C-alpha cells in the first residue's frame, strides 16, 4: 500500500511533552535549528506551561513568539488522534512509555504519521511492534523508537564502522561506552518501570520473536556475556543489559551491508576491575530493589520527573563510545563522542532525528524501524554538523 500523502497537513513537526525536562531542551534546540519555513508546534497537557515555555524560547528566538500551542493528553486518545492527523512528524518525550506511550503510537500508525521517541524500554518497543507494525506498514508511518542516547550513538556508530569494513564478510563489533553524566527524574522513573517487569519484558520479547521475520541466509547475534578486558581500549568491559544491542541487531538484520554473520557485544568501559565489579553489583541491586513496590517508590522519590542536572553540571558532562571491529582481515577502532549524553546531546539527537524524517531524502521504509535503517547516513551527517563526532581512532 502506498505511503499516505501528509504534505498538506498543518504542521511539519509537533513536539509532544515539550514542558518536561528533556522536552524543554528539545524545544530549545528546535527553536534555533528548524529550517526557514518549517511549520512546527508545541504540545502538552498544560496550556499555561506551554505558554511559559514559548515565552522563554522567544527570548532567544523571537520567531517563537507566535509558535502554535496544542493541548493533548495521553489519557485522552481522541486528542492524540487529532494531534497525529495534523502533522507529518510527531516527536514525544512523554514517559514512562509503558505507562503513557501506546495511544500515541497507535494514532501515528493509523494516520501515516512518522513517530519519534526517546524510549529505552525494550518491553514497550516489542509490544508496539506486535500491535502496530502491520498498521504502520500499511499507512506508511515510520515508528522510530530509541532516538536519543538510547540508542543513536550505538546504532549509527556501528553502521558507520561497518561501512569502513570489507563487504560480504563476517563482522564482529564490540562497543565500550564511557561517560561522567548524571540523569533526571524522568529517566529514573522510566528505568525503574522497566526494571520492575522482567517477566513481562521476557514475554513481550517472545511474542515479538514469534511474528518478526528473520534475515534469510544471514546470522545476526547480540549476545550477553561475561566482563572482558579490552587491550585496544585499555578498559574493562562490563556487559550492559540495555536496549542498545537489540537496536543494533535489528539494524543488522535489516541491512545486508552488515555481512553474512554479524555479532555485536555491548559494554560499559571502566579503567579498573574493582569499579567494573562494583558497577555490575550496583546495577543488580537497583534491579532487585525495583521488584519491591516500597523500594521502587523510595528510589523514584530521589528525583521527581521534570528534575535534572543543572546547566553547569551538563556542561562538564561527556560521553565516548569506542567500537572495536574486525572483518575480512581488517581490524579498526572507531569512536562516537560528544557532550552531555542524557540531556543536551539527547535533545540534539531527538530533534535531528525528527528533522531528518521531515526534510531529508531518505530510503523508502515503513513500520517500526531503527535510526540506522530509517535515516542512516543522513542523520549521521546531521549529527556531525551539530558537533557529535564520528571518527577512526586506529586502523
Task: Name every feature range the model reports, one short phrase each.
Residues 35-49:
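Conserved glycine-rich Rossmann-like NAD(P)H-binding loop of the short-chain dehydrogenase/reductase
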Amino acid at each position: 500500500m502506498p505511503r499516505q500523502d501528509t504534505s498538506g497537513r498543518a504542521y511539519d513537526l509537533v513536539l509532544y511533552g515539550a514542558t518536561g525536562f528533556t522536552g524543554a531542551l528539545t524545544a530549545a534546540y528546535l527553536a534555533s535549528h528548524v529550517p526557514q519555513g518549517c511549520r512546527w508546534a508545541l504540545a502538552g497537557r498544560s496550556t499555561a506551561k506551554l505558554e511559559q515555555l514559548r515565552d522563554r524560547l522567544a527570548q532567544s528566538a523571537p520567531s517563537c513568539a507566535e509558535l502554535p500551542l496544542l493541548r493533548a493528553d495521553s489519557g485522552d486518545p481522541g486528542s492524540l488522534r487529532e494531534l497525529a492527523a495534523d502533522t507529518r512528524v510527531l516527536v514525544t518525550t512523554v514517559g514512562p512509555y509503558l505507562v503513557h506511550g501506546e495511544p500515541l503510537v497507535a494514532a501515528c500508525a493509523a494516520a501515516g504519521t512518522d513517530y519519534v521517541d526517546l524510549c529505552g524500554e525494550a518491553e514497550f518497543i516489542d509490544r508496539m511492534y506486535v500491535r502496530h507494525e502491520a498498521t504502520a506498514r500499511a499507512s506508511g508511518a515510520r515508528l522510530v523508537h530509541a532516538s536519543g542516547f538510547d540508542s543513536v550513538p550505538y546504532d549509527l556508530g556501528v553502521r558507520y564502522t561497518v561501512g569502513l569494513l570489507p563487504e560480504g564478510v563476517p563482522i564482529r563489533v564490540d562497543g565500550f561506552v564511557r561517560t561522567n553524566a548524571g540523569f533526571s527524574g524522568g529517566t529514573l522513573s522510566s528505568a525503574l518501570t522497566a526494571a520492575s517487569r522482567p517477566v513481562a519484558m521476557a514475554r513481550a520479547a517472545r511474542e515479538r520473536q514469534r511474528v518478526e521475520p528473520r534475515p534469510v541466509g544471514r546470522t545476526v547475534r547480540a549476545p550477553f556475556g561475561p566482563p572482558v578486558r579490552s587491550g585496544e581500549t585499555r578498559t574493562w568491559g562490563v556487559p550492559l543489559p540495555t536496549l542498545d544491542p537489540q537496536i543494533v541487531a535489528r539494524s543488522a538484520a535489516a541491512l545486508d551491508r552488515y555481512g553474512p554473520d554479524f555479532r555485536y557485544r555491548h559494554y560499559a568501559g571502566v579503567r579498573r576491575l574493582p569499579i567494573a565489579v562494583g558497577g555490575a553489583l550496583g546495577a543488580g541491586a537497583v534491579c532487585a530493589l525495583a521488584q519491591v513496590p516500597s523500594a521502587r517508590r523510595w528510589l523514584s522519590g530521589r528525583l521527581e520527573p521534570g528534575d535534572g542536572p543543572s546547566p553547569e553540571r551538563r556542561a562538564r558532562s561527556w560521553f565516548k563510545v569506542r567500537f572495536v571491529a574486525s572483518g575480512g582481515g581488517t581490524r579498526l577502532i572507531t569512536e562516537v563522542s560528544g557532550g552531555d549524553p542524557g540531556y543536551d546531546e539527547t535533545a540534539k539527537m531527538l530533534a535531528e532525528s525528527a528533522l531528518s524524517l521531515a526534510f531529508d531524502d531518505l530510503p523508502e521504509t515503513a513500520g517500526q524501524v531503527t535510526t540506522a535503517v530509517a535515516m542512516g547516513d543522513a542523520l549521521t551527517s546531521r549529527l556531525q554538523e551539530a558537533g557529535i563526532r564520528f571518527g577512526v581512532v586506529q586502523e
